[in-house]
Amino acid sequence: MASSSKAKSAFSQPFLFLYQLLQWLLHKALSPQPPPANGTGRRPRVAVIGAGITGVTAASHICGHGFEAVIFEAGPEEQLGGIWSRVNDTSGLQIHSVMYRFHPSVLWQQGYPDRAQIVTEVRRLWARYGLQDKTRFNTRVERVYQDAGGTWIVNGPTHGRFDGVIVAVGTCGEAKMPPLAGMEDFVGPVVHSSELSARHVDVTGKQVAIVGGGASAVEALEFAMANKAAQVTVLSRSEKWIIPRDAVVDALLSLNIFGRETSLSWIPEWLLRHFFYGPELEELSPPSNKGFFTDTPMVNSDIMVCLRDGRARWLRGDIEMLTENAVIVNRRARGVPKNGPGHHETVTADVVVMATGFHRPSLAMLPDDCFVEPYQCPNWYLQTFPPQHPSLSAINCTFVNAVGSVGNWHIGIYTRILLMFLIDPLTRPSPVWMRRWVDMTRFLKRGAPTAAFDFFTYLELVAWFVFCVCVNPFRWKWAIFVFFGVGLSWPRAFVRREERLLNSQGYRLRDLGSSF
């Protein structure tokens, strides 16, 4: 079910050809020039923690603009690409790749690339910007702290000092495998959804039970269908929305600028129930009190086809126990909470797949003052900058739920905002104003069914960026660079003039961020 990594001829498909042409034009217009071989970037020097998509993308932007980056990765080089280096061979993008353009130089060969092509693009980006010599593999970051001069130290002084830090550890760490009663009695394999390919699990002609109802369950279902399982039963505890695998629909749903349920939210919910779920699957949709703009949806159309033709079943309930060849489930009706009343049902299974997700990587390596209530993550400035440290940004590892994409061009915008703060002291926000922005966002989203930063949409994120640049006149000169990654020389020339005008010492004193 996952798309093949062997792309079809672009010339035989006009839309694909136009898409690839657009990608090439964006690459030529917006990709920073790779640094010269064996060249040393100028200050600022930035530490990047994590070598997944976010870490490699951020480091490539930093080096492409002539600055220095060092990547710290806890795993070996085989884990370059983060979670994509560890998932199944059948895994692929659920959203269209137009929403997964994590760098301007990425050139997708098709709309829904598979794992192999995604990892290939990450490695190509890593090599293009000369990050091989700047990556420290097998180096787990235990502590990030500042010296007396305010520069950052990672683990210890042996790695040198850094002007800024980007934390890019993501949200998917070690596989989560909760114990189930009777697991030792089950005669077949019990395996995590991310290890199906690695462990060569044979599901051909077998009954497969998938424990879990999120993105991992979709991945496991794709693997089972691709390998011709006889029957697949998804056992989901949660009530999650499923949306079509359609670029236009997905983009429209991310355009709710308020980032919360509104009086018009019933419209997309009604449309999904009546035209995507349909009358035969409407019971699988979340109850009316579970709004769409409260949780991350699953993006898949094939699953609905499998449910309609009987190859798969979707049961809502709680796992009671495993027996020798079955899973006992407390099956609940729609709207009944987890562990609520239901009735027992026996699901026969030859293979049990634990689609239970991943442990979230810890941010405990950061200074304690990053986690002071009520401004703990995700309640940070622009959701990534802790109020005490505008020289530190945790990109793609603080969000809870969203409608949009974690692998899109916001990675570059966040990185360039950090560079702006590092280069130009007059643009740096003070801790007071960073906290006031958090308070303002909470006020604007008061009354929402979720906490202010527990859910957002992509258009809301863009609005945050626009507000960040517009609210401070000294940031206006950086707007083109921040949003498009071009024209760095113009704001840098302004910075030099401002420094001479204000006197360098007075210029430095205008930095109110405690991390400088």
Question: Can you say where each PLM-predicted feature lies in the sequence?
Answer:
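Beta1-alpha1 glycine-rich phosphate/pyrophosphate-binding loop at the start
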Residues: 3-16, 48-133, 230-231, 236-247, ...
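Rossmann-like dinucleotide-binding core of oxidoreductases
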Residues: 20, 33-41, 53, 58, ...
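FAD-site-proximal beta/loop scaffold in flavoenzymes
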Residues: 189, 193-199, 325-328, 344-345, ...
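Short hydrophobic core segments
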Residues: 49, 160-173, 208-211, 346-359
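Short, conserved active-site loop motifs that form the nucleotide-linked donor/cofactor pocket
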Residues: 133-135, 188-189, 311-313, 392
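C-terminal catalytic lobe of FAD-dependent flavoproteins
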Residues: 284-370, 449-516
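Feature captures the FAD/FMN-dependent oxidoreductase FAD-binding
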Residues: 111-173, 307, 321-326
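C-terminal, flexible cofactor-proximal segment of oxidoreductases
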Residues: 2-32, 382-383, 390-516
